[in-house]
Amino acid sequence: MSMTDLLNAEDIKKAVGAFSAIDSFDHKKFFQMVGLKKKSADDVKKVFHILDKDKSGFIEEDELGFILKGFSPDARDLSAKETKTLMAAGDKDGDGKIGVDEFSTLVAES
């Protein structure tokens, strides 16, 4: 399954373009722009599993840096600052990684 099976390709392209500048990434705006906020809980979980590249059941900090590439292969990597900000927002239990429920909460709070 690919991201465009779940989200509109044009919305993804616009959202990735909107955050092309380093240190401009805002996960709340990004999730809204790609249409993730409007998706069912099931679809949000499917997106999580696409982003969980190593299939560990968590998005670790190293995977988080590549989150935009999970939506579009030609997107940029997040900066260290953006990655840490996103991890702080999503890692509710402080274990250094984002689980599927934490990701769902992160999207819902967007």
UniProtKB/Swiss-Prot annotation:
The UniProt record lists the keyword Transport: no
Binding site for Ca(2+) 1: 52, 54, 56, 58, 60, 63
Domain EF-hand: start-end pairs: 39-74, 78-110
Pfam family, one: EF-hand_7
InterPro entries: EF-hand-dom_pair, EF_Hand_1_Ca_BS, EF_hand_dom, Parvalbumin
Modified sites of kind Phosphoserine: 2, 24
GO MF annotation: an example: calcium ion binding
Residues annotated for Ca(2+) 2 binding in this entry: 91, 93, 95, 97, 102
Keywords recorded for this protein, A-Z: Acetylation, Calcium, Metal-binding, Muscle protein, Phosphoprotein, Repeat
CDD domains: EFh_parvalbumin_alpha
Family statement drawn from the similarity comment of this UniProt entry: Belongs to the parvalbumin family.
Domain free text: AB domain, comprising of helices A and B, is involved in structural stabilization, protecting the hydrophobic core of the protein. It is required for high-affinity binding of Ca(2+) and for Mg(2+)-binding.
Reported function: In muscle, parvalbumin is thought to be involved in relaxation after contraction. It binds two calcium ions.
Protein name: Parvalbumin alpha
Gene designation per UniProt: PVALB
